[in-house]
Protein backbone atom coordinates (compact mmCIF):
# COMPACT_ATOMS: atom_id res chain seq x y z
CA UNK A 1 0.00 0.00 0.00
CA UNK A 2 2.84 2.35 0.77
CA UNK A 3 4.02 2.28 -2.83
CA UNK A 4 0.64 2.68 -4.52
CA UNK A 5 -0.58 5.52 -2.33
CA UNK A 6 2.15 7.81 -3.68
CA UNK A 7 0.35 8.03 -7.00
CA UNK A 8 -2.77 9.44 -5.34
CA UNK A 9 -0.86 11.92 -3.19
CA UNK A 10 1.92 13.25 -5.43
CA UNK A 11 2.03 11.73 -8.94
CA UNK A 12 5.12 12.67 -10.96
CA UNK A 13 3.54 12.61 -14.44
CA UNK A 14 6.92 12.92 -16.14
CA UNK A 15 6.81 13.56 -19.87
CA UNK A 16 9.18 10.66 -20.66
CA UNK A 17 6.97 8.29 -18.67
CA UNK A 18 3.96 9.52 -20.60
CA UNK A 19 5.69 8.75 -23.90
CA UNK A 20 6.28 5.19 -22.75
CA UNK A 21 2.65 4.93 -21.74
CA UNK A 22 1.54 6.11 -25.19
CA UNK A 23 3.50 3.23 -26.70
CA UNK A 24 1.89 0.82 -24.25
CA UNK A 25 -1.57 2.16 -25.12
CA UNK A 26 -0.87 1.73 -28.83
CA UNK A 27 0.35 -1.82 -28.29
CA UNK A 28 -2.79 -2.67 -26.33
CA UNK A 29 -4.96 -1.07 -29.01
CA UNK A 30 -3.36 -3.16 -31.75
CA UNK A 31 -3.82 -6.29 -29.67
CA UNK A 32 -7.51 -5.49 -29.24
CA UNK A 33 -7.87 -5.14 -33.00
CA UNK A 34 -7.33 -8.88 -33.23
CA UNK A 35 -10.43 -9.50 -31.10
CA UNK A 36 -13.81 -9.36 -32.83
CA UNK A 37 -15.71 -8.00 -29.83
CA UNK A 38 -13.12 -5.30 -29.19
CA UNK A 39 -13.56 -4.26 -32.81
CA UNK A 40 -17.30 -4.21 -32.31
CA UNK A 41 -16.94 -1.95 -29.28
CA UNK A 42 -14.81 0.46 -31.31
CA UNK A 43 -17.35 0.45 -34.13
CA UNK A 44 -20.30 1.01 -31.81
CA UNK A 45 -18.60 4.03 -30.28
CA UNK A 46 -17.49 5.36 -33.67
CA UNK A 47 -21.01 5.13 -35.14
CA UNK A 48 -22.92 6.50 -32.16
CA UNK A 49 -24.54 9.92 -32.32
CA UNK A 50 -22.03 12.80 -32.45
CA UNK A 51 -21.83 14.54 -29.09
CA UNK A 52 -23.27 11.58 -27.21
CA UNK A 53 -21.04 10.39 -24.32
CA UNK A 54 -20.94 6.92 -25.88
CA UNK A 55 -19.21 8.41 -28.91
CA UNK A 56 -16.19 9.23 -26.76
CA UNK A 57 -15.91 6.02 -24.75
CA UNK A 58 -13.47 3.97 -26.81
CA UNK A 59 -9.82 3.01 -26.71
CA UNK A 60 -7.25 5.47 -27.98
CA UNK A 61 -4.03 4.73 -29.81
CA UNK A 62 -0.82 6.52 -30.70
CA UNK A 63 -2.41 8.24 -33.66
CA UNK A 64 -5.35 9.62 -31.69
CA UNK A 65 -3.01 10.94 -28.99
CA UNK A 66 -0.55 12.37 -31.53
CA UNK A 67 -3.44 14.06 -33.35
CA UNK A 68 -4.48 15.68 -30.08
CA UNK A 69 -0.99 17.10 -29.63
CA UNK A 70 -0.97 18.34 -33.23
CA UNK A 71 -4.22 20.17 -32.47
CA UNK A 72 -2.56 22.05 -29.63
CA UNK A 73 -3.73 19.86 -26.75
CA UNK A 74 -1.15 19.38 -24.01
CA UNK A 75 -1.68 15.82 -22.81
CA UNK A 76 0.33 16.29 -19.64
CA UNK A 77 -1.78 19.27 -18.61
CA UNK A 78 -4.99 17.39 -19.41
CA UNK A 79 -3.95 14.39 -17.33
CA UNK A 80 -2.99 16.61 -14.40
CA UNK A 81 -6.36 18.35 -14.66
CA UNK A 82 -8.07 14.95 -14.64
CA UNK A 83 -6.10 14.07 -11.52
CA UNK A 84 -6.96 17.34 -9.77
CA UNK A 85 -10.67 17.11 -10.62
CA UNK A 86 -11.37 13.47 -9.88
CA UNK A 87 -8.63 11.85 -7.79
CA UNK A 88 -9.83 12.91 -4.35
CA UNK A 89 -11.32 11.19 -1.34
CA UNK A 90 -14.89 12.17 -2.16
CA UNK A 91 -14.89 10.07 -5.33
CA UNK A 92 -12.56 7.24 -4.35
CA UNK A 93 -13.32 3.93 -2.66
CA UNK A 94 -10.77 1.75 -0.87
CA UNK A 95 -10.92 -1.91 0.12
CA UNK A 96 -8.10 -3.52 2.11
CA UNK A 97 -7.92 -7.27 2.74
CA UNK A 98 -5.27 -8.54 5.15
CA UNK A 99 -4.54 -11.01 7.89
CA UNK A 100 -4.07 -8.34 10.54
CA UNK A 101 -6.79 -7.15 12.91
CA UNK A 102 -9.27 -4.50 11.79
CA UNK A 103 -7.67 -2.01 14.18
CA UNK A 104 -4.25 -2.52 12.61
CA UNK A 105 -5.61 -2.30 9.06
CA UNK A 106 -7.52 0.87 9.92
CA UNK A 107 -4.39 2.41 11.43
CA UNK A 108 -2.40 1.66 8.28
CA UNK A 109 -5.09 3.12 6.04
CA UNK A 110 -5.34 6.34 8.04
CA UNK A 111 -1.57 6.69 8.19
CA UNK A 112 -0.89 5.98 4.52
CA UNK A 113 -3.96 7.53 2.88
CA UNK A 114 -4.44 10.44 5.25
CA UNK A 115 -2.73 12.81 2.81
CA UNK A 116 -5.04 12.00 -0.11
CA UNK A 117 -6.80 15.18 -1.12
CA UNK A 118 -10.26 15.55 0.39
CA UNK A 119 -13.25 16.36 -1.77
CA UNK A 120 -17.05 16.45 -1.80
CA UNK A 121 -18.96 13.17 -1.53
CA UNK A 122 -20.75 13.14 -4.87
CA UNK A 123 -21.95 10.46 -7.25
CA UNK A 124 -21.01 11.30 -10.81
CA UNK A 125 -23.72 10.76 -13.38
CA UNK A 126 -23.75 11.35 -17.11
CA UNK A 127 -27.10 12.40 -18.51
CA UNK A 128 -27.94 12.90 -22.15
CA UNK A 129 -30.93 13.27 -24.42
CA UNK A 130 -31.53 11.34 -27.60
CA UNK A 131 -30.67 7.83 -28.79
CA UNK A 132 -27.17 6.39 -28.83
CA UNK A 133 -27.49 5.15 -32.42
CA UNK A 134 -29.65 5.98 -35.41
CA UNK A 135 -32.55 3.61 -35.92
CA UNK A 136 -32.83 1.36 -38.96
CA UNK A 137 -29.13 0.73 -39.45
CA UNK A 138 -27.30 -2.54 -39.93
CA UNK A 139 -23.53 -2.62 -39.44
CA UNK A 140 -21.43 -5.31 -41.06
CA UNK A 141 -18.01 -5.81 -39.56
CA UNK A 142 -15.21 -7.88 -41.04
CA UNK A 143 -14.29 -10.65 -38.59
CA UNK A 144 -10.82 -11.74 -37.54
CA UNK A 145 -11.89 -15.26 -36.59
CA UNK A 146 -13.74 -17.78 -38.72
CA UNK A 147 -17.15 -16.87 -37.27
CA UNK A 148 -20.54 -15.46 -38.15
CA UNK A 149 -22.07 -13.48 -35.28
CA UNK A 150 -25.40 -11.67 -35.12
CA UNK A 151 -25.23 -9.08 -32.34
CA UNK A 152 -28.47 -7.36 -31.31
CA UNK A 153 -28.52 -4.52 -28.78
CA UNK A 154 -31.39 -2.64 -27.15
CA UNK A 155 -30.93 0.60 -25.20
CA UNK A 156 -32.67 0.50 -21.82
CA UNK A 157 -32.93 3.26 -19.22
CA UNK A 158 -30.51 3.22 -16.30
CA UNK A 159 -31.68 0.58 -13.82
CA UNK A 160 -29.07 1.16 -11.13
CA UNK A 161 -31.57 2.28 -8.50
CA UNK A 162 -33.38 -1.05 -8.95
CA UNK A 163 -30.33 -3.26 -8.39
CA UNK A 164 -32.05 -5.19 -5.57
CA UNK A 165 -34.65 -6.44 -8.06
CA UNK A 166 -32.16 -7.87 -10.58
CA UNK A 167 -34.66 -7.28 -13.38
CA UNK A 168 -32.00 -7.69 -16.06
CA UNK A 169 -31.11 -11.12 -14.70
CA UNK A 170 -34.70 -12.27 -15.15
CA UNK A 171 -34.78 -11.07 -18.77
CA UNK A 172 -31.40 -12.67 -19.53
CA UNK A 173 -32.63 -15.93 -18.05
CA UNK A 174 -35.82 -16.03 -20.12
CA UNK A 175 -34.44 -14.76 -23.44
CA UNK A 176 -31.32 -16.92 -23.21
CA UNK A 177 -33.15 -20.07 -22.09
CA UNK A 178 -32.05 -23.20 -23.97
CA UNK A 179 -34.75 -25.69 -22.96
CA UNK A 180 -37.61 -27.11 -25.00
CA UNK A 181 -39.82 -24.46 -26.58
CA UNK A 182 -37.15 -21.76 -26.28
CA UNK A 183 -35.96 -19.42 -29.00
CA UNK A 184 -32.57 -21.13 -28.92
CA UNK A 185 -33.98 -24.63 -29.36
CA UNK A 186 -36.12 -23.57 -32.30
CA UNK A 187 -33.33 -21.78 -34.19
CA UNK A 188 -30.89 -24.58 -33.36
CA UNK A 189 -33.29 -27.19 -34.75
CA UNK A 190 -33.44 -25.26 -38.01
CA UNK A 191 -29.67 -25.40 -38.28
CA UNK A 192 -29.29 -21.62 -38.22
CA UNK A 193 -27.38 -21.03 -34.98
CA UNK A 194 -24.61 -22.59 -32.91
CA UNK A 195 -25.26 -20.68 -29.67
CA UNK A 196 -27.36 -17.87 -28.23
CA UNK A 197 -26.55 -15.73 -25.22
CA UNK A 198 -28.58 -12.88 -23.71
CA UNK A 199 -26.61 -10.69 -21.35
CA UNK A 200 -26.12 -7.32 -19.77
CA UNK A 201 -22.58 -7.00 -18.46
CA UNK A 202 -21.47 -4.37 -15.96
CA UNK A 203 -19.46 -2.57 -18.63
CA UNK A 204 -22.74 -2.07 -20.52
CA UNK A 205 -24.37 -0.38 -17.51
CA UNK A 206 -24.03 3.34 -16.82
CA UNK A 207 -26.07 6.32 -15.75
CA UNK A 208 -26.54 7.07 -19.47
CA UNK A 209 -28.14 3.74 -20.36
CA UNK A 210 -28.12 -0.02 -19.93
CA UNK A 211 -27.28 -1.92 -23.13
CA UNK A 212 -29.00 -5.31 -23.31
CA UNK A 213 -27.31 -7.62 -25.82
CA UNK A 214 -28.17 -10.85 -27.58
CA UNK A 215 -25.16 -12.59 -29.15
CA UNK A 216 -26.02 -15.31 -31.66
CA UNK A 217 -23.31 -17.41 -33.29
CA UNK A 218 -24.62 -18.36 -36.73
CA UNK A 219 -24.02 -21.32 -38.98
CA UNK A 220 -23.23 -20.73 -42.66
CA UNK A 221 -26.90 -21.20 -43.51
CA UNK A 222 -27.91 -18.96 -40.62
CA UNK A 223 -25.86 -16.13 -42.09
CA UNK A 224 -28.28 -16.11 -45.02
CA UNK A 225 -31.29 -16.00 -42.66
CA UNK A 226 -30.43 -12.99 -40.51
CA UNK A 227 -33.77 -11.24 -40.88
CA UNK A 228 -35.79 -14.40 -40.40
CA UNK A 229 -33.85 -14.95 -37.16
CA UNK A 230 -34.52 -11.38 -36.01
CA UNK A 231 -38.17 -11.93 -36.82
CA UNK A 232 -38.31 -14.98 -34.57
CA UNK A 233 -36.55 -13.02 -31.81
CA UNK A 234 -39.46 -10.59 -31.86
CA UNK A 235 -42.02 -13.37 -32.07
CA UNK A 236 -40.53 -14.79 -28.89
CA UNK A 237 -40.59 -11.37 -27.22
CA UNK A 238 -44.24 -10.98 -28.22
CA UNK A 239 -44.96 -14.34 -26.59
CA UNK A 240 -43.30 -13.07 -23.42
CA UNK A 241 -45.22 -9.80 -23.13
CA UNK A 242 -48.57 -11.22 -21.94
CA UNK A 243 -46.90 -14.03 -19.97
CA UNK A 244 -44.26 -12.05 -18.09
CA UNK A 245 -43.65 -11.28 -15.39
CA UNK A 246 -44.12 -14.66 -13.72
CA UNK A 247 -43.24 -14.56 -10.05
CA UNK A 248 -42.07 -18.19 -9.94
CA UNK A 249 -39.17 -17.25 -12.23
CA UNK A 250 -38.13 -14.49 -9.83
CA UNK A 251 -38.38 -16.88 -6.85
CA UNK A 252 -36.26 -19.44 -8.66
CA UNK A 253 -33.59 -16.86 -9.48
CA UNK A 254 -33.77 -15.59 -5.89
CA UNK A 255 -33.01 -19.08 -4.57
CA UNK A 256 -30.22 -19.64 -7.09
CA UNK A 257 -28.64 -16.31 -6.13
CA UNK A 258 -28.71 -17.26 -2.46
CA UNK A 259 -27.07 -20.61 -3.17
CA UNK A 260 -24.37 -18.99 -5.30
CA UNK A 261 -23.61 -16.59 -2.46
CA UNK A 262 -23.57 -19.24 0.27
CA UNK A 263 -21.45 -21.71 -1.70
CA UNK A 264 -19.27 -19.22 -3.59
CA UNK A 265 -15.70 -20.36 -4.08
CA UNK A 266 -12.95 -18.31 -2.50
CA UNK A 267 -11.56 -15.76 -4.95
CA UNK A 268 -8.06 -14.46 -5.38
CA UNK A 269 -7.73 -11.67 -2.81
CA UNK A 270 -6.64 -9.08 -5.37
CA UNK A 271 -9.71 -9.73 -7.51
CA UNK A 272 -12.01 -9.85 -4.49
CA UNK A 273 -10.75 -6.50 -3.15
CA UNK A 274 -11.08 -4.93 -6.60
CA UNK A 275 -14.63 -6.24 -6.98
CA UNK A 276 -15.70 -4.95 -3.57
CA UNK A 277 -14.22 -1.51 -4.30
CA UNK A 278 -16.22 -1.42 -7.52
CA UNK A 279 -19.36 -2.47 -5.64
CA UNK A 280 -18.87 0.44 -3.24
CA UNK A 281 -19.50 2.71 -6.22
CA UNK A 282 -22.71 0.87 -7.16
CA UNK A 283 -24.40 -0.43 -4.03
CA UNK A 284 -25.36 0.77 -0.59
CA UNK A 285 -22.78 -0.17 2.04
CA UNK A 286 -24.90 -2.98 3.50
CA UNK A 287 -25.13 -4.63 0.06
CA UNK A 288 -21.49 -4.39 -1.05
CA UNK A 289 -20.72 -8.07 -0.41
CA UNK A 290 -24.14 -9.50 -1.28
CA UNK A 291 -25.24 -7.06 -3.98
CA UNK A 292 -24.11 -9.15 -6.96
CA UNK A 293 -26.28 -12.07 -5.84
CA UNK A 294 -29.34 -10.44 -4.30
CA UNK A 295 -32.84 -10.73 -5.78
CA UNK A 296 -34.73 -9.02 -3.01
CA UNK A 297 -38.02 -7.72 -4.38
CA UNK A 298 -40.51 -8.54 -7.10
CA UNK A 299 -41.69 -5.67 -9.35
CA UNK A 300 -44.27 -6.67 -11.96
CA UNK A 301 -44.76 -3.16 -13.32
CA UNK A 302 -41.02 -2.55 -13.79
CA UNK A 303 -40.56 -5.70 -15.87
CA UNK A 304 -43.50 -4.75 -18.08
CA UNK A 305 -42.05 -1.23 -18.46
CA UNK A 306 -38.60 -2.46 -19.50
CA UNK A 307 -40.03 -5.01 -21.95
CA UNK A 308 -41.52 -2.02 -23.76
CA UNK A 309 -38.02 -1.03 -24.91
CA UNK A 310 -37.56 -4.28 -26.86
CA UNK A 311 -38.79 -2.82 -30.15
CA UNK A 312 -37.27 -2.89 -33.67
CA UNK A 313 -36.88 0.90 -33.69
CA UNK A 314 -34.80 0.67 -30.49
CA UNK A 315 -32.53 -2.09 -31.77
CA UNK A 316 -29.02 -1.97 -33.16
CA UNK A 317 -27.95 -4.79 -35.50
CA UNK A 318 -24.31 -5.77 -36.00
CA UNK A 319 -23.18 -8.68 -38.16
CA UNK A 320 -19.61 -9.88 -37.63
CA UNK A 321 -18.44 -12.24 -40.35
CA UNK A 322 -15.44 -13.15 -42.47
CA UNK A 323 -17.86 -13.63 -45.38
CA UNK A 324 -18.80 -9.98 -45.49
CA UNK A 325 -18.44 -9.48 -49.22
CA UNK A 326 -20.85 -12.33 -49.96
CA UNK A 327 -23.74 -10.99 -47.89
CA UNK A 328 -23.74 -7.19 -48.14
CA UNK A 329 -26.84 -7.09 -50.36
CA UNK A 330 -29.15 -9.17 -48.18
CA UNK A 331 -32.90 -8.76 -48.26
CA UNK A 332 -34.36 -5.76 -46.48
CA UNK A 333 -31.37 -3.42 -46.47
CA UNK A 334 -29.57 -1.38 -49.09
CA UNK A 335 -26.04 -0.03 -48.87
CA UNK A 336 -26.14 3.49 -47.47
CA UNK A 337 -22.55 4.56 -47.89
CA UNK A 338 -20.76 1.59 -49.38
CA UNK A 339 -17.52 0.33 -47.94
CA UNK A 340 -15.81 2.65 -45.52
CA UNK A 341 -12.13 2.00 -44.96
CA UNK A 342 -11.05 3.32 -41.57
CA UNK A 343 -7.55 1.90 -41.38
CA UNK A 344 -6.05 5.23 -40.28
CA UNK A 345 -7.98 5.02 -37.01
CA UNK A 346 -9.23 1.49 -36.51
CA UNK A 347 -7.54 -0.74 -39.06
CA UNK A 348 -10.56 -2.78 -40.16
CA UNK A 349 -13.42 -2.63 -42.65
CA UNK A 350 -17.07 -2.08 -41.90
CA UNK A 351 -20.17 -1.32 -43.92
CA UNK A 352 -23.28 0.64 -42.91
CA UNK A 353 -26.62 -0.27 -44.42
CA UNK A 354 -29.99 1.41 -44.10
CA UNK A 355 -33.25 -0.38 -43.47
CA UNK A 356 -35.95 -0.27 -46.14
CA UNK A 357 -38.65 -1.90 -43.99
CA UNK A 358 -38.74 -3.12 -40.39
CA UNK A 359 -37.60 -6.70 -39.84
CA UNK A 360 -40.67 -7.34 -37.71
CA UNK A 361 -42.84 -7.15 -40.83
CA UNK A 362 -41.04 -10.12 -42.35
CA UNK A 363 -42.01 -12.52 -39.59
CA UNK A 364 -45.42 -13.74 -40.70
CA UNK A 365 -47.50 -15.69 -38.19
CA UNK A 366 -46.26 -16.73 -34.79
CA UNK A 367 -44.64 -20.14 -34.90
CA UNK A 368 -46.39 -22.56 -32.56
CA UNK A 369 -43.12 -24.27 -31.61
CA UNK A 370 -42.00 -21.25 -29.59
CA UNK A 371 -43.24 -21.46 -26.03
CA UNK A 372 -42.39 -20.03 -22.65
Positions of PLM-derived features:
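Acidic/histidine-enriched segments that form metal/cofactor-coordinating
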Residues: 1-82, 128-138, 151-152, 166-202, ...
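Short, hydrophobic beta-strand segments
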Residues: 150-154, 210-219
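Generic recognition of flexible, low-complexity loop/linker segments
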Residues: 80-84, 138-140, 199-204, 301-307, ...
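An aromatic/glycine/proline-enriched structural segment found at the starts
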Residues: 50-65, 88, 93-159, 244-267, ...
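A generic structural motif
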Residues: 9, 98-100, 156-160, 216-224, ...
Amino acid sequence: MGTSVTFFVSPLMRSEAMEREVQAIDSEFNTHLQDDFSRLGQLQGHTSSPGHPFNRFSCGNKKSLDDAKDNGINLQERILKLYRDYYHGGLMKLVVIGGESLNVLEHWVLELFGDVKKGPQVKLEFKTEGPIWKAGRLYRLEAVDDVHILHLAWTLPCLQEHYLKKLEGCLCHVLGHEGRGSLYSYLKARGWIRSLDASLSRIDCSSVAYIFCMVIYLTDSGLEKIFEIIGFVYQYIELLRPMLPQEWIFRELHDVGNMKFIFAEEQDQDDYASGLAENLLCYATQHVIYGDYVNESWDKELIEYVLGFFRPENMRIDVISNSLFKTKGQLGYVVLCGWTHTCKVFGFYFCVQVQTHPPSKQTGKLYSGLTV
